[in-house]
């Protein structure tokens, strides 16, 4: 294949632009349009005569998932072995961007070795609710922490010359109906909570691609949302890379191209090409729109293809396993350690109980699932830990069924040990792409086991595996609680390193753990019965809500214990940042995460009680003191003013609060900040509950005042965007039967305790996705025929489906021949 030689050898943007302009002039409209959609599930189209290679994209937020055979977007089919690193939710608890960059570098190295040009991650959606089934893939409830950690991953991945792909842009915080839901959110909340993390990534790490989300935002699909993609992403932030759709996430391909979306994935086939050509020919969009997107794509293709071609096809798997173990260890959070039960002394007699000890839960389910090169188990690593094992008992059924015999065996074993290491957690069904959690509870059989074991042996250490927070009413039944999250393939060894004191735990929570789900701010507006998702809580997500509204929590944001203690002193502050002294006052070395929160108690523009605006992680020997500096950036004091439509600063006195967690503030200083003298954006509006933070009482009128417009009507329409699960709303017996069959399959899989992810995806999939995810076998004309069928025009609908099917076959064949021979 002829290649543009200097684009492959010389990293000079100006030369590549000249070559790309030359290529663009040689391509006809059909060729251009064909390049803007995928060739297969994970590859782009190649044009040999023009010297345009194909590149491979692959899932990989916590490890590379390149599928060797039949490809799918849900992680159902096997993939090439790779290192499974701890998930983003886990590594976020390290609060260590340097560590994140190391992980990203290793993942990028493995991706390039497997000839992957674009690694689809990291994910940094804001954790609006603890029930989001994909929270294990996301960093935090706080956009600043999410942005800083995600930026570190992107820098690491792209240090190999390939592209990272931060996702899902934006306001995509639930799995239910994720391809059809409409996130109704006010502009200030959108900017401050749901876009700030992405802004940090774009400006600080310069990703080459970004993935748009499935959902609508205020009535417009994210992938064709001009305000999101052109005004903000490309305009305000200066992003000049490629925007890639989520798989099947394109609604109107032409509008996507016009409004800033570059590449439609996976492989919609010839119908997408014709759709784009017709849009140009009809004047709906211009050829200049197509050229702009193609220029972005060619830059990505030539840049990353060159990097992949020159990269080694091998990597040091042992070194990456060691990194995965270190990352997991630095991310483990010690939540309770009564009477300093940990660390365990060498030779301590321990009983290991819990199914997770023999079959670890170390990653989430769905498209992020990695085919791990190897997986350490707790039982195997125990042999090298220096502890004396008195035996193992599974203790409980993993899927939650009562088992008295297993529990009795575990209790008997517990009585023989000095300490019980009880491995509990959420099973694979509880947390998955495509599914939201139904509750925040640990399985009843695990709680009953804990109570029984604790009665037999009070020295019970709960080792918890879960990708998101849990309710902990059972906390009093254990002396120690250690949260390992989802620790990746080396997580078991990392946990034993912490339990035995080889590693002093330094992780701190990146999300609040509440006492009960009923305490969460979005409880009444998360994953409801309709398509519309009202973000009524506004700015008050996570600790921003709990601390403003005075809601007690189990474990606050930023919380985590250590085997040593730290003292804070000598705080000096101004509007540019703080310096202070931190001293290790304990008897062992350890790391402390110093957190900087900004507050304005006398604010005239309502805001949360305090917000994270900086942090630093430092390692100190016993008795060692060190000066810590934390700088404040341009986001420290700003708020989005909906009246001036820009970032503003309210002038006056601010508190800079430095602490070991959001609830453990050690030092406070006041600084004076010059304001921008902007008008009050909420003057004359009745926003009582937003001012107080008591947002669970927000009225319809208040929310509409915050939005600046009425809440749209939530209706199911019989059109291309009706989901397969909504076909019972139509007027077609065939649709009713199809919906009932899907519902039966779905319910049956749940009843068996093994939800079928493919059926879940299909049930929540809009009809248009049939034309976007079948490699050209289904056209949008066929979908329109199906819509006619569902509207009750049965014969006309069926005949149109048949006609469009034949037409699509002929047109696809003709187009492919033209593309091959041109």
Task: Show where each model-derived region lies.
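Glycoside hydrolase catalytic-domain context in secreted enzymes
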Residues: 2, 7-635, 639, 653-657, ...
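Terminal connector regions
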Residues: 634-681
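Long, charged, low-complexity terminal extensions
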Residues: 715, 719-776
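Charged, amphipathic alpha-helical linkers/stalks
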Residues: 669-737
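C-terminal non-catalytic accessory extensions
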Residues: 754-822
């Amino acid at each position: 294949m002829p290649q543009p030689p200097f684009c492959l050898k010389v990293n000079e943007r100006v030369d590549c632009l000249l070559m790309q302009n030359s290529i663009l002039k040689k391509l006809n409209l059909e060729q251009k349009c064909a390049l803007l959609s995928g060739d297969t599930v994970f590859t782009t189209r190649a044009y040999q005569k023009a010297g345009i290679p194909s590149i491979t994209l692959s899932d990989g937020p916590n490890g590379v998932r390149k599928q060797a055979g039949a490809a799918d977007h849900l992680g159902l089919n096997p993939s090439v072995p790779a290192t499974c690193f701890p998930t983003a939710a886990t590594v976020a608890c390290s609060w260590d961007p340097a560590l994140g960059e190391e992980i990203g570098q290793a993942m990028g190295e493995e991706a390039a070795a497997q000839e992957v040009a674009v690694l689809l991650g990291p994910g940094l959606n804001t954790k609006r609710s603890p029930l989001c089934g994909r929270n294990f893939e996301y960093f935090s409830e706080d956009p600043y922490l999410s942005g800083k950690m995600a930026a570190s991953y992107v820098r690491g991945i792209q240090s190999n010359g390939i592209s990272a792909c931060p996702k899902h842009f934006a306001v995509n915080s639930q799995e239910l109906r994720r391809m059809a839901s409409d996130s109704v959110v006010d502009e200030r909340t959108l900017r401050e909570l749901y876009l700030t993390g992405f802004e940090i990534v774009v400006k600080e790490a310069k990703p080459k691609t970004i993935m748009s989300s499935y959902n609508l935002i205020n009535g417009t699909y994210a992938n064709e949302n001009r305000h999101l993609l052109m005004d903000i992403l490309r305009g305000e932030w200066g992003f000049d890379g490629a925007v890639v759709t989520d798989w099947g996430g394109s609604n109107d391909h032409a509008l996507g191209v016009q409004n800033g979306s570059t590449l439609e994935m996976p492989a919609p086939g010839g119908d997408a090409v014709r759709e784009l050509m017709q849009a140009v020919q009809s004047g709906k969009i211009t050829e200049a729109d197509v050229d702009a997107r193609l220029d972005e794509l060619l830059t990505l293709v030539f840049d990353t293809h060159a990097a992949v071609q020159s990269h080694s096809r091998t990597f040091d798997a042992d070194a990456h396993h060691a990194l995965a173990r270190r990352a997991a260890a630095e991310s483990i959070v010690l939540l309770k350690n009564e009477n300093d039960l940990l660390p365990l002394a060498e030779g301590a007699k321990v009983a290991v109980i819990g199914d997770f000890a023999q079959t670890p839960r170390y990653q989430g389910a769905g498209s992020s699932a990695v085919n791990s090169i190897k997986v350490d188990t707790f039982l195997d690593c125990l042999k090298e830990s220096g502890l004396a094992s008195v035996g193992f008992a599974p203790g409980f059924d993993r899927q939650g069924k009562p088992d008295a015999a297993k529990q009795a065996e575990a209790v008997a074993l517990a009585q023989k040990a000095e300490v019980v290491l009880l491995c509990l957690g959420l099973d694979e069904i509880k947390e998955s792409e495509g599914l939201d959690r139904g509750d925040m509870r640990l399985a009843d059989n695990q709680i009953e086991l804990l109570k029984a074991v604790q009665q037999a042996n009070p020295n019970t250490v709960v080792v918890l595996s879960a990708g998101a927070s849990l309710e902990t009413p059972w906390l009093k039944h254990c002396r120690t609680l250690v949260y390992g999250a989802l620790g990746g393939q080396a997580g078991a060894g990392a946990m034993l390193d912490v339990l035995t004191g080889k590693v002093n735990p330094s992780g701190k929570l990146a999300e609040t753990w509440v006492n009960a789900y009923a305490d969460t701010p979005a409880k009444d507006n998360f994953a409801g019965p309709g398509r519309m998702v009202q973000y009524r809580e506004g700015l008050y997500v996570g600790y921003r809500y709990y601390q403003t509204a005075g809601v007690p929590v189990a474990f606050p944001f930023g919380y985590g214990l250590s085997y040593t203690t730290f003292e804070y002193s000598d705080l000096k502050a101004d509007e540019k940042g703080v310096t202070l002294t931190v001293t290790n006052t304990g008897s062992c070395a350890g790391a402390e995460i110093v957190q900087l929160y900004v507050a304005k108690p006398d604010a005239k523009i309502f805001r949360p009680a305090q917000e994270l605006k900086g942090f630093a992680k430092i390692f100190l020997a016993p008795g060692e003191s060190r000066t810590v500096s934390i700088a404040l950036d341009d986001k420290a004091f700003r708020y989005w003013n909906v009246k001036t439509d820009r970032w503003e600063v309210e002038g006056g006195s601010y508190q800079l609060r430095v602490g070991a967690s959001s609830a453990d503030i050690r030092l406070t200083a006041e600084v004076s900040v010059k304001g921008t003298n902007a008008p009050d954006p909420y003057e004359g509006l009745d926003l009582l509950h937003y001012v107080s933070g008591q947002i669970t009482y927000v009225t319809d009128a208040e929310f509409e005042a915050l939005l600046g417009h009425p809440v749209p009507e939530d209706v199911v329409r019989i059109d291309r965007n009706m989901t397969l699960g909504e076909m019972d709303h139509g007027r077609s017996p065939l649709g009713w039967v199809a919906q009932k069959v899907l519902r039966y399959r779905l319910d049956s899989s749940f009843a068996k305790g093994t939800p079928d992810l493919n059926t879940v995806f299909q049930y929540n999939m809009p009809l248009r996705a049939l034309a976007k995810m079948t490699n050209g076998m289904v056209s949008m004309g066929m979908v329109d025929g199906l819509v006619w069928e569902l509207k009750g025009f049965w014969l006309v609908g069926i005949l149109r489906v048949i006609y469009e099917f034949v037409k699509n076959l002929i047109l696809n064949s003709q187009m492919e021949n033209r593309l091959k021979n041109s």
